[in-house]
Design a protein with these regions (language model features):
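N-terminal secretory signal peptides that target proteins for export/translocation
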Residues: 1-24
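Bacterial N-terminal signal peptides
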Residues: 25-39
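N-terminal leader/linker segments that initiate helical-solenoid repeat arrays
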Residues: 43-82, 87
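Short helix-capping/linker turns of helical repeat alpha-solenoids
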Residues: 48, 89-92, 123-127, 138-140, ...
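Short coil/turn and helix-start
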Residues: 73-74, 106-114, 122, 138-145, ...
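Hydrophobic face of amphipathic alpha-helices that form TPR/SEL1-like repeat modules
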Residues: 100-106, 131-138, 168-176
Length: 201
């Protein structure tokens, strides 16, 4: 951690160190501790965000910041601890909310999962539409699937730049017995996903 050196004067005039005000009569140790505490809080916030990314990054997210973690690799309690801390520090970061939702999904807390995904959607985070589409497509974490809602959400996610939504639509349309079964549509969306695959990784 970098420090700024300040020469203390013998007068009572205030001296700013970091964002705290100290006087020359105050012990420099106290001033230093106050400055360090501010830096430590910032470091902790950054660490919780990085840990949330490390534990629950989603491949479908065009803005993922760490190597993606598949569903089997999710450790629900650890993800919840790290990502809950991250959203407390950065409540407007949609990525952390989506990743928090993955933690809740893993431990089958459906209501908390939906709240986290919906929060990310309200923040305008694109992959939130995809996460909700998968939930309504599969029925995981909710009472029952809603394919109409899933289709709408997949298409909105795709329009917002989430390429994996094309794969979701292909799977939605290629399920025999489903009211959405349509091999022609499935082929169109599969082709769109294949065209993006190299870029998506």
């Amino acid at each position: 951690m970098a420090f700024s050196l300040v020469k203390l004067r013998t007068s009572n005039s205030p001296i700013q160190i970091g964002s705290r005000w100290c006087t020359a009569k105050a012990r420099w140790v106290l001033c230093l501790l106050l400055t360090l505490s501010t830096g430590l809080v910032a470091d902790k916030a950054t660490a919780s965000g990085a840990e949330c990314d490390r534990l629950a990054s989603i491949a479908a997210d065009p803005d993922h910041q760490s190597a993606p973690v598949d569903y089997n690799g999710i450790d629900g309690p650890k993800v919840i601890d790290a990502c809950r801390e991250a959203v407390m520090q950065f409540p407007d970061n949609g990525r952390y909310w989506v990743q928090l939702g993955r933690g809740y999904l893993k431990i089958e807390q459906g209501n908390a999962m939906l709240e986290a995904f919906q929060k990310a959607k309200l923040l305008g985070y694109p992959v939130a539409w995809f996460a909700l589409a998968v939930v309504y497509h599969t029925g995981n974490g909710i009472d029952e699937a809603d394919l109409n809602r899933a289709e709408i959400l997949y298409k909105e996610a795709y329009q917002r730049g989430v390429g994996y939504a094309a794969l979701g639509l292909a799977r939605l349309y290629d399920e025999p017995g489903s009211p959405f079964f349509d091999l022609e549509k499935a082929g169109v969306w599969e082709s769109r996903f294949d065209a993006l695959k190299d870029r998506l990784g």
